[in-house]
Amino acid sequence: MNQEVMNLFNPQAPAQVFDSIRISLASPEKILSWSFGEIKKPETINYRTFKPERDGLFCARIFGPIKDYECLCGKYKRMKYKGVICEKCGVEVTLSRVRRERMGHIELAAPVAHIWFLKSLPSRIGTLLDMTLKDIERVLYFENYIVTEPGLTALKEHQLLSEEEYMIAVDEYGEDSFTAMIGAEAIHDLLAGMDLEKIAGDLRSELASTTSELKQKKYLKRLKVVENFMESGNRPEWMIMKVVPVIPPDLRPLVPLDGGRFATSDLNDLYRRVINRNNRLKRLIELRAPGIIVRNEKRMLQEAVDALFDNGRRGRVITGANKRPLKSLSDMLKGKQGRFRQNLLGKRVDYSGRSVIVTGPELKLHQCGLPKKMALELFKPFIYARLDAKGYSSTVKQAKKLVEKERPEVWDILDEVIREHPVLLNRAPTLHRLGIQAFEPILIEGKAIQLHPLVCTAFNADFDGDQMAVHVPLSLEAQLEARVLMMSTNNILHPASGAPIIVPSQDMVLGLYYLSIVNQNEPGEGMVFADMGELQHALETKAVTLHAKIKGRFRTVDAEGKVVSKIHDTTPGRMIIGELLPKNVNVPYETANQEMTKKNISKMIDTVYRHCGQKETVIFCDRIMALGFAHACRAGISFGKDDMLIPDSKIKLVSDTEALAKEYEQQYNDGLITQGEKYNKVVDAWAKCSEKVADEMMARIKAVEFEDNGRQKPMNSIYMMSHSGARGSPTQMRQLAGMRGLMAKPSGEIIETPIISNFKEGLTVLEYFNSTHGARKGLADTALKTANSGYLTRRLVDVAQDCIVNSVDCGTDKGLTMQPIVDAGQVVASVGQRVLGRTALDDINHPVTGDLLVKAGTLMDERDVEQIEKAGVQSVRIRSALTCEVRVGVCAVCYGRDLARGTPVNQGEAVGVIAAQSIGEPGTQLTMRTFHMGGTAQVVDSSFLEASYEGKVEIRNRNVVRNSDGQQMVMGRNMAVLILDEAGKERATHRVTYGSRIFVDDGDKVKRGQRIAEWDPYTRPILTEIEGRVAFEDLVDGISVQETADESTGITKREVIDWRSTPRGNDLKPAIVVQDAKGKVGKLSKGGDARFLLSVEAILSVEPGAQVRPGDVLARIPMESAKTKDITGGLPRVAELFEARRPKDHAIIAEIDGTIRFGRDYKNKRRIIIEPHDSTLEPVEYLIPKGKPFHLQDGDVIEKGDYILDGNPAPHDILAIKGVEALASYLVNEIQEVYRLQGVSINDKHIEVIVRQMLQKVEITTQGDSTYIPGDHVDVIELEEVNERLIEDGKKPAEGQPVLLGITKASLQTPSFISAASFQETTRVLTEAAVAGKTDMLQGLKENVIVGRLIPAGTGGTMSQIRRIATSRDELIIDERRKASGVEVAEPMLADMTTAAQ
């Protein structure tokens, strides 16, 4: 009943139900249909009465009353006159809320162009009329006339005429023989007279006939715009406005301030200018003013409307009274403070509070301590309701008083209300979903929120003054979700890697580590204990210490659940930890019977979670935390200055290195080495010294010492802290007790003089000064890093937000191949680690016995992975989000395991957002530096190869010859040495470069660490592969070759110099030729001549006439790259990969298999042609800058995908040449490498999800019978649908190839214009969408948040599914009725968000 009465007084309009939103151009009629009246005056309100002026910008007659149900003059008041229009003031009696909804309009005296369609590049008006923007502006702003109808004169259509030319033309041809116009009317008439269909037809035929690429591009661009207009039903002349809509007054309010001044929205100023100029123009036209004055006024009107829509887009910015630019309609939408990001995506919530956090070690994992005062305020509505229900108060007012007085019954009720009502805790910045979790509140005294220590890692919180916010979920559904999905006990695993995130840290680790230490010769060593009771007794009486070696009986259960006991060698401390382990057959005592470093504790928790489930894990974690704290306190581990031991050998090491540095200095002064080499050598020497000192220090701190009675001395406490993983790292210890070592300048260069002292000894003034560089740079970096990392996360979320698990299985037979990642012979990630939690694509068989290990379609868990590792499987095909064939989102089987739960992923999981968070969250830990590799600050690529395993050698693509010195030389460009174990399984693969000396052969046995090959790291050799005599060609002294004597050694070397710099040398082609016995040029095995072209700086190694054998070195080319190499690392590298940018010196990749031929060179580029083996293909040519080190010879055979020029490959090339799978593995490995360096583990599948989003588009190559144009970027899904329809109709389908888009570009090209507009470049996105009349189907998360609905993921996904089913049923019912009655039933109206300005 109450509700009905309320509804009568405050009628709620039913919310519009809609499934999609369309945006298009508004016609003048449409604008008039929205409007409630014309605004004729620029006045706003009367300064004395504060009432709105009639016909002004706030007019009550047009926009509605100011007070609810009361007209302006006060004649009609109250509800009973609802809907009456007052005859005196003309105001309708209704709710004042309509002032937020009713629009007005301004009739313009002259048409004006809409600036968005004029200036937003590419200009839509310009493209349609096929005129340049400059020309159109000349017409619009009244500089030139434009010929609209040339008649029979010599003028051309669309020709521009200046004032003079126009006059001359009128004199010459007479006024009626042609039509030329000026201003927006001219453009309007031209647009109105366009026959779009004819233009489209003409353009298509032009396209078919033209061959020039430039023209093609131009026609394509124009055709696209023309087709957009045709398809959307927009008319071109609507881009010129005759009526300007005025937004409702309450959206541009005028607020009185104290002191009789007003604060107003800038829009009012902008509208006032438009109205003033419009009225003045009307008056001038009525007065028949001279044309020049009218024109000037029209131009000013155009500028005023431009400023209203987009201030500052053209001409100077219009500023207000305080010299601040006025905020136009476009500015209202744009940027972080615009409507989209400020109000639609970021809303403030009520029922929240924030306070400082303190630690609450006695809490359970699912609890948090909430200050009473805070709880009382947050739960007020619930308390009022309970007070009412219990009869303590009858009105809200009474309840309020009771609460304010804080009566005892209020506290009792607060306890009741809070019971089992979870609250959400959030710590900013919320970088991933674990930044908001639900807890059950426990009321506490004081004013600080208590937080459970174990969840600190997830929140990245510490107790040095951090604050957290509390939010109260109000509705029952919200409470349910908080409890079931967000409770801290449900978030045990990290969504990024699947590793436990509820892991003890710091003090707790220290306590557990202390408990698990084993010491020699402790009291009670060798005792045997039957159970924990005995042990406790012995510990109390000090008969045994925590660290003594003892035997103890430990009880656990077997597979049937029966108790079994076994005696273990252990210590009392470890028995205490073991006692806490859940009793389970898969959690053996060994899990606790080891040194409790942070890593081992994490593994232990992981084991417990996998085998015992969530509840047991939570209880176990709580107990282990309490144990850790207790023993950290009892251990009394402290940090003293004397714990830092400086190694005695430091002085000697430092003096040795100083002597070395002096020697290098001397060598430099004698001219034996260059300054760069000296710098590198000195830096190298100091780096080695610093390493050695650190090693000595660690050895000394680690050393086990004994007292006189033979008992082991307590362990060094600093070592304990560092080794256990509680706090500190070896690098920090090195700075405290070793030597600080080398420092970098802000530019990234390393300062030659190191800091020899450590912090214990204290730094000298100079050393201190040098060390401040690095510290200052570190702070500056940190600030930049945070912003950059946040921006990366935002782009990632934006590109991946609509990737949701939508179906169970797409049934694809595509997938990725997973192999171990090997870095410098070390396996960094094994196959097992990579396939855990993924679905097998094919059956996985044992490589030796052929037994089936895992069936295809199995989600591989720890047990399967263990089998795969045991069997030594080296490559596994798995399903991946990248190759999933679901139309929208991904399917559960391709995605695999939900890492945060350890179970198959649920439908409706927003995997895109989780992927974005997992990659973005560790962003702040990555470095910002680009590493400058000065010379050999680190030794240039190693110069030898050692076997990383024992085994048998197998050589792939073997091409080895024995040279004159009897050494085996590698002649193959892609030769690889494999090391196999006994079972013949491949353990390691090493590429061996051309020109290396190799020491092993097929079938040899090698030991670990044995040399396999070596090469000169600083030069690349040119080898001969035939026997013969050497002859020189075009090697002319002083022009193309010169002898230089080394000053220090006096040895001369002959070096090729740049021969093109002299006029005589222009046509030379310096080369070394190997001749056969008859003195003719020898032939190579592949058929080319034995002529070896030399590049600049090549050093000759042979004399003319010398006899050579295969494998001998003819010349050496110094490697440029050894000098300096910038390595982009850290965050910039990740961003570069996700943005799919071409690296600066990118590699050139061969597109086809073929033979290399050298073409005619250009001035500073080399032309290289690949002649394909397959005669049906065309040869491909590449241009390579001459200075680049280039190692291929004429006649070399090259395979598709080989590098012609070394460097970082551009991802686009990999996609085009090697395909999607190669691209995926490249991106995944490169991105993982950056994170691995920082010790961050992220699962591959997250990167795959993002890459999937980057590959959503296809570039049309052949159009078939579709309406697409070659070069169009189309969604994969859309192309498939169109092709299906074409094939059904028996037509030719369109073809396309996948394109890789960077994440920013991909976000802007999403099918949803709302999502794109709220990301970046709002104006451009909306302009494009309006011209094309785009419809947003509201599929992603972002669009739904913006229009204020539940997101179609998680629990909201079910709702949207139900809504979809309901809609389809409605349509069925309507159809049925239609058929039954034979009458057309009106379609339910879709909400039409046709916007004019936006």
Swiss-Prot record:
Q: How is the cofactor bound?
A: Binds 1 Mg(2+) ion per subunit. Binds 2 Zn(2+) ions per subunit.
Q: Report which reactions are catalysed by this protein.
A: RNA(n) + a ribonucleoside 5'-triphosphate = RNA(n+1) + diphosphate
> Residues that bind Zn(2+) 1, according to the entry?
71, 73, 86, 89
Q: Which GO terms describe its molecular function?
A: DNA binding; DNA-directed RNA polymerase activity; magnesium ion binding; zinc ion binding
Mind telling me which GO cellular component terms the entry cites?
Answer: DNA-directed RNA polymerase complex
One GO process term, biological-process aspect: DNA-templated transcription
Q: What class of enzyme is it?
A: transferase
Q: Identify the keywords attached in UniProt to this record, alphabetized.
A: DNA-directed RNA polymerase, Magnesium, Metal-binding, Nucleotidyltransferase, Transcription, Transferase, Zinc
- Which InterPro entries does the UniProt entry name for this protein? DNA-dir_RpoC_beta_prime, DNA-dir_RpoC_beta_prime_bact, RNA_pol_asu, RNA_pol_N, RNA_pol_Rpb1_1, RNA_pol_Rpb1_3, RNA_pol_Rpb1_3_sf, RNA_pol_Rpb1_4
Its cofactor is:
Mg(2+); Zn(2+)
Q: What is its EC number?
A: 2.7.7.6
Q: Which residues bind Mg(2+)?
A: 462, 464, 466
Q: Where does Zn(2+) 2 bind?
A: 810, 884, 891, 894
Query: SUPFAM superfamilies attached here?
Result: beta and beta-prime subunits of DNA dependent RNA-polymerase (SSF64484)
Q: How does it assemble?
A: The RNAP catalytic core consists of 2 alpha, 1 beta, 1 beta' and 1 omega subunit. When a sigma factor is associated with the core the holoenzyme is formed, which can initiate transcription.
| Family to which this protein belongs | Belongs to the RNA polymerase beta' chain family.
HAMAP family registered for this protein in UniProt: RNApol_bact_RpoC (MF_01322)
Please explain the role this protein plays, according to its UniProt record. DNA-dependent RNA polymerase catalyzes the transcription of DNA into RNA using the four ribonucleoside triphosphates as substrates.
Q: What is this protein called?
A: DNA-directed RNA polymerase subunit beta'
